[in-house]
Amino acid sequence: MELSLSFPVSWLCALFTAIALYCIAVAFYRLFLHPLAKFPGPFLWKISIWPTVWQCAHGKRHLDLLAAHKRHGPVVRIGPNMLSYNTGSAARTIYASRHANVRKSDFHLTVDASVSAPSLFSIVDREKHAFRRRVVSQAFTEKAMMDASEFYLKYMKVFLDVLHDKVGTGWTKVDIQEHATWWTSDTMGDLSLGRSFNCLTEPTFRHAIPMMRNGLRYIYWAGHLPFRDLVDYILAHPILSRYGGQSAVDNRNYFDFCETAIQERIKEEQDALAAGADEESRRKDYIHYLLAAVDPETGEKLTKNELESDASLLLAAGGDAMSNAIAGIMFYLARHDFARDRATAEIRHQFASAEDIRQGPGLAACTYLEACILESMRMAPPVATSPLERVTVGNGIEVDGHWFPAGITLGVCFYALNFNETIHKDPYRFRPERWLSSEEGITAEDVQQSKSNFFPFSAGHRHCPARNLASRNLKVFIANMLWHFDLRPATSLGVNESSGEEGQTGLFCIEDALISIADGPVLEFKARLGYNASSS
């Protein structure tokens, strides 16, 4: 009996000893022999990927990386095989050059693991990405963007009617992020899927918004797990919808919803073509342009699965990213009287009627409003916060004086870059003037330094293809809000008044979940004296 008991015990002891020795050996290698051993960073981050998984799961990775850069400098080792930079030169080297020896990391494969084809965002292969980029960019020509802007304006009018009805003539509390999300969801649903969610006027599909966000949260941390290949397999397996938890279920349901809507829209477009409908009579949405798009180099078109993936991407990125940008801008305008009053005066002086607020010379002349938008997006970036990971390939790459062989993961923490004191003076202070060389004490060189080191939609040939469309309609939205309403902070901004990093107060609180996710702010609005929805 003693022999039979001691036998498994001894084997268990041997097994645990072997595991312990293996872990010690791996830690020793990563600390002292790894190609990144000389770079500073928190101890646990150097030896394990699990701190990254934890940060992603809790939505605070951008704050942890900001603190790490403040402590360790412009380059920080944030994983056993990963570095983060907070310099503009690194961003230009890693992201902007078409010839840089880097590719997207395998994390991106997890983003679309549960669908039939990768989207433009998640394609790792550079040649395949170039093909997709050439095709998808045809949905963002000047003509296509003008057509898309009509969708934004259509739902802008609905939004204003809803807000006027809610606000009336007295000061009324409004969760601006919630209402902006309804606007972007309705707009992007109609534009990307051919189906408006009608969130502004009825609650039926409002559940789809947290469903999409939960899916993003799940992908963000699951894609960084050390057994990512297994995660990708599970994401694509039906068993996930039963045992994967609510976030996993929401991720699957979101893609199923998009797939059904897109298939119906494709059939509608094909039926119109078969019936001989002329070009002018057909809907000019994303599906219309993507179905017609042909790669000028190969003559190929998107497959049905590729079209579904890219339309779903446009819905997610174009909807939540814009609503979070709106939330951040309104937060900072409400908190800073000097900026709000000046931007409001500029808009109301420029436009006698709200009907005139659209893309054109009049809106382009509102330079202070543009500066407020840029400054808000610097302090609360709606898209790029934590590093967009790139893996070195071929003969390696030199970044800020350091040479890296193939197989190293690099990235720029854009949130830390935006608060880099060597680039943006007094970075925790809301200063729209930093973007205007006409302001006293601001030189053209100061403005150029800020603009050349600012990447709200990433950089280079892999930046967001919809960035120009988003920027234009973001400005239209904010201009309409300032024309129609007076605003001020609510008595309490609640969870949206962040303590920031290292005691910095008054920062808008965002969650890092692949893109930024915001909650609120709750602000007080009052209809502009003498104006209402009908008079606009």
UniProtKB/Swiss-Prot annotation:
PANTHER family: CYTOCHROME P450, CYTOCHROME P450 MONOOXYGENASE ATNE-RELATED. One of its GO terms (cellular component) is membrane. Heme binds at C464. Its EC number is 1.-.-.-. This is Cytochrome P450 monooxygenase fscF. Keywords: Heme, Iron, Membrane, Metal-binding, Monooxygenase, Oxidoreductase, Transmembrane, Transmembrane helix. It comes from the Eukaryota. Signal peptide: none annotated. Cytochrome P450 monooxygenase; part of the fragmented gene cluster that mediates the biosynthesis of fusarochromene, a tryptophan-derived metabolite closely related to a group of mycotoxins including fusarochromanone. Within the pathway, fscF catalyzes the epoxidation of desacetylfusarochromene which opens the way to the production of fusarochromanones. The first step of the pathway is the epimerization of L-tryptophan to D-tryptophan in the presence of the NRPS-like tryptophan epimerase fscC. Belongs to the cytochrome P450 family. Its cofactor is heme. The gene is fscF.
